[in-house]
Amino acid sequence: MPLTFYVDRRAWRAHHQRVLADRPALVPVVKGNGYGFTLPLLAEAARQLGPAGVDQIAVGTAQEAARVLGFFPHDLVLLEPFLPGAEWVDLPDRVVRNAASVDAVRMLAGRRLVIDCRSSLRRQGVARTELRELRSALRGGEAEGYCVHLPMERPARADPVREVSDWVFALREAGLAVPVMYVSHLSRPELEALGLRFPRTRFRLRTGTDLWLGDRSAIEARATVLDVRPVARGERIGYRQGRARRGGWIVVVSGGTVHGVGLEAPKIMRGVLPRAKELGRSGLRAMNRTLSPFSWQGRRHWFAEPPHMSVSMIHLPGTQAPPRPGGELVADLRHTATHFDRVAIFNEDLATPASLPRQGAAGARPAACVSSSSSS
């Protein structure tokens, strides 16, 4: 029984239309694990947004582009820069390569390409001091556009509009045409300010998280309950044979480390309260107490022990009625790091109303549910 990602297609599409109305010329980002949806599903969703003006998608790597070519008929712009000397992946001409160094531009000259500009993110890109050399590397040709990838969080005095503007001025002063500038993490007023300042340049916002995951009411992750067993206080359980702290129930659910359950990326802590909470969580983990992402009856519960490869063991107190095998627990997971067994789409047909099954209903599934394996 699977770890399932439910998608209300009707609500999801309505959110897409709202985002597109607010951010014209948007370029959807389709990369990584597909934000939990899978890459083909996102590419197909972007294709359906064509009438709203979506004529490009931004794809993480050349390998990812090869996977989604059959699902999106227009241009694919790579986010990963070409590395001279790396293995070359043959792709059709509608895939636009990315260059982040003068050497890469020199090797890609004559091909369709966009060029990364080094921003305050300090991650990759050509520097302003290299622009004359860059012009020579283009050998009389032109890039289809330039990219300025901006930080999500900025110091109080940071001005992203000025940062992008400085790059447009610098490129033009070097004799380079800037027909398109790809940007990220800018608001609509900031985009409008750039458009007024540079009417001959088209500013295109690359967006992934806000577009695909921005309406949490349209999506929900759920883990299938595989088994429920009573446990007495002090009874040994699990691979590591730790003792149960209290009597109650051990609930075995789908979803383990292979799915991304229990895996956590480092976080930036700002302020006293977030740091204090993190210290508290660290103290609990040192005592082998870790809160799981799984909820039952509106409450998250503790891992009985660290998640296994494909399942997790959760402890429920004996005072609470447990779920039944075949039911589901809501899972609060990081979508960009989770690989679901199944993506279940409902409200696919607008003439067929549907809703999520009640939590814990054994075997219940939404009507008009279309399943997609995460391996597709």
At which residue positions do the language-model features occur?
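Active-site-proximal beta-alpha core segment in soluble small-molecule metabolic enzymes
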Residues: 3-14, 24-177
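Active-site anion/phosphate-binding pocket segments in diverse small-molecule metabolic enzymes
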Residues: 5-8, 28, 162-376
